[in-house]
From Swiss-Prot:
The gene is sst1b. It comes from Carassius auratus. One of its GO terms (molecular function) is neuropeptide hormone activity. This is Somatostatin-1B. Residues 20-87 form a propeptide. One of its GO terms (biological process) is regulation of cell migration.
């Protein structure tokens, strides 16, 4: 996701530079345009280097490390949820629905 946002910002910068280059010749002063182009190049280099510093080197190499399953949710909470589900599945359906409250007809319930 971070890589996608950095690519979008890079494309926007390149698009703005390209759009500025299309300005009519009479609106651009040669000396001023050289200064602006130098400043723009420096700005673009700073932005690109900042974006590349934020990106991990493994992403640049094309290696995306898999996220371990345990990092998403601790084992205790998964076991606890499974135990609650097993207890509720042993009850009849009417008893399982008892703690839930219907707020509106045919919409959502809160358990």
């Amino acid at each position: 996701m971070q890589l996608l946002s950095s690519l979008v910002s890079l494309l926007l910068v390149l698009y703005s530079v390209r759009a500025a280059a299309v300005l009519p010749v009479e609106e651009r002063n040669p000396a001023q345009s050289r200064e602006l182009s130098k400043e723009r190049k420096e700005l673009i280099l700073k932005l690109i280097s900042g974006l590349l510093d934020g990106v991990d080197n493994s992403v640049l190499d094309g290696e995306i490390a898999p996220v371990p399953f345990d990092a998403e949710e601790p084992l205790e909470s998964r076991l606890e949820e499974r135990a609650v589900y097993n207890r509720l599945s042993q009850l009849p359906q009417r008893d399982r629905k008892a703690p839930c409250k219907n707020f509106f007809w045919k919409t959502f319930t809160s358990c």
